[in-house]
Amino acid sequence: MISSNEFKTGLTIEVDNDVYTIIEFQHVKPGKGAAFVRTKLKNVKTGGITERKFNAGEKVPKAHVERREMQYLYKDGDHFVAMDNETYEQTSLTEAQIGDGVKYLKENMNLGILFFNGTVIGVDLPNTVILEVAHTEPGVRGDTATGGSKPATLETGAVVQVPFFVNEGEKLIIDTRTGNYVQRA
């Protein structure tokens, strides 16, 4: 059990038989009445976001989420197969479990898989990945004066905005959290 006074962003709790991750929280002390904690919670199974108030000091069960390092192996139809780095056990993941990270999956990439009661509830990708540019329009001399950008299709099929000087075949570092170009690799 954890007190609502100890809430912090990223903490995983159980509320109404569901598992939630705290996205935002705020301690509120009104002029009249008891203090409370206003939270924004994300359901780890459905991805839905809900707001909820907890009384100050209210005890809430902490969800014991296990994080295992796994390696992404290959795509099999609608499923993505990952292997546990310690036990070599394979786990099948759906696109919904991976979320937007599907665009950046590359074979042999290490992932953090989150389990709750033996069920996959989420996937943590590395913060950055190195991907090759599969297609982009060639930059024209003088384009860089404005510091603009152009779309580039990466080897995984993801489309990102890149500076004009980036050409096909170059390897780029991409931030998986925002989907933005960081720099050349």
Curated annotation (Swiss-Prot):
PROSITE patterns: EFP. InterPro entries: Elong-fact-P_C (IPR015365), NA-bd_OB-fold (IPR012340), Rib_uL2_dom2 (IPR014722), Transl_elong_fac_P/YeiP (IPR020599), Transl_elong_KOW-like (IPR013185), Transl_elong_P/YeiP_cen (IPR001059), Transl_elong_P/YeiP_CS (IPR013852), Transl_elongation_fac_P (IPR011768). GO terms for cellular component: cytoplasm. Pfam families: EFP (PF01132), EFP_N (PF08207), Elong-fact-P_C (PF09285). It is found in: Cytoplasm. Pathway: Protein biosynthesis; polypeptide chain elongation. One of its GO terms (molecular function) is translation elongation factor activity. The keyword RNA-binding does not apply. One of its GO terms (biological process) is peptide biosynthetic process. Keywords: Cytoplasm, Elongation factor, Protein biosynthesis. Gene3D superfamilies: 2.30.30.30, Nucleic acid-binding proteins. Involved in peptide bond synthesis. Stimulates efficient translation and peptide-bond synthesis on native or reconstituted 70S ribosomes in vitro. Probably functions indirectly by altering the affinity of the ribosome for aminoacyl-tRNA, thus increasing their reactivity as acceptors for peptidyl transferase. HAMAP family: EF_P. Belongs to the elongation factor P family. This is Elongation factor P. It comes from Desulfitobacterium hafniense (strain Y51). The gene is efp.
